[in-house]
């Protein structure tokens, strides 16, 4: 009987699993990324790719019932589908098997207040961009991160794209000469028909300064353009 040929992804998976022998997976929880969240699905998928994380707890919606229902649909223990992030930080810190890392997938206006109680309990943070809604919050966040000596990672997803890495390599090697001018555009049209289209209305918080800070769309979307500029050059 012919031996089945393993695909490259399968071999890569096995290599990573071999590296993990004797190591426990990092227990991770999420705040945000609920039923209608595109980025929430992406983060949960990414956490499974290299088999190094175990998703065990979360808060997924401001609506308590919706949050619990969604959490259990993902296979979580009902006791670890929390009503709010503060309760989650408190309860997880009491568990011997509590979370070691937290993924934050909420509007930026909530990033600081969500991260703070977890950092104070020595939980490492993986947060969506932008860092915070205001500079003052960013400065305060930096201080507590340094005080508690945890890892705070800010996700900029486009830096993983192969074409961007190729562009970065070309520029670093000087193949196009000295870069004198950079023009970055990041067009999106989701606000068109925002009152009528359900998929658009889900994102209307980006136009609410109470949810994403005074910069609103400039920080939420503009941060992609700024990061692309800095990363590639």
What are these regions (language model features)?
Residues 80-144:
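Beta-loop-alpha module in the N-terminal Rossmann-like domain of NAD(P)-dependent dehydrogenases
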Residues 1-25, 193, 200, 220-233:
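Contiguous beta-strand/loop segments that form the cofactor/metal-binding neighborhood of enzyme cores
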Residues 2-76:
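N-terminal Rossmann-like dinucleotide-binding module
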Residues 140-158, 178-181:
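Rossmann-fold dehydrogenase core element
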Residues 127, 133, 152-154, 183:
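Hydrophobic residues in well-ordered beta-strands that form the structural core
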Residues 159-233:
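Predominantly a Rossmann-like dinucleotide-binding segment in NAD(P)-dependent oxidoreductases
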């Amino acid at each position: 009987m012919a031996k089945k040929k393993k695909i490259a992804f399968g071999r890569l998976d096995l290599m990573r699993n071999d590296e993990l022998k004797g190591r426990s997976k990092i227990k991770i929880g999420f705040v945000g990324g609920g039923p209608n969240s595109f980025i929430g699905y992406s983060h949960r998928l990414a956490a499974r790719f290299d088999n190094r994380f175990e998703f065990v707890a979360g808060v997924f919606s401001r609506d308590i019932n919706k949050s619990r229902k969604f959490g259990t649909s993902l296979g979580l223990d009902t006791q670890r589908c929390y009503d709010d992030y503060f309760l989650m930080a408190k309860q997880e810190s009491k568990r011997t098997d509590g979370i070691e890392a937290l993924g934050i997938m909420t509007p930026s206006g909530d990033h600081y207040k969500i991260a703070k109680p977890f950092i104070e309990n020595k939980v490492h943070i993986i947060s969506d961009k932008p860092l915070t809604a205001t500079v003052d919050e960013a400065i305060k966040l930096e201080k507590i991160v340094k005080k508690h000596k945890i890892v705070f990672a800010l996700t900029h997803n486009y830096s993983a794209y192969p074409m961007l890495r190729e562009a970065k390599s070309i520029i670093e090697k000087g193949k196009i000469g000295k870069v004198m001018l950079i023009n970055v555009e990041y067009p999106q049209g989701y606000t068109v028909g925002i009152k009528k289209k359900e998929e658009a209305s889900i994102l209307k918080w980006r136009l609410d300064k109470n949810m994403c800070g005074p910069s609103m769309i400039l920080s939420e979307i503009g941060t992609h353009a700024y990061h692309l500029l800095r990363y590639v050059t």
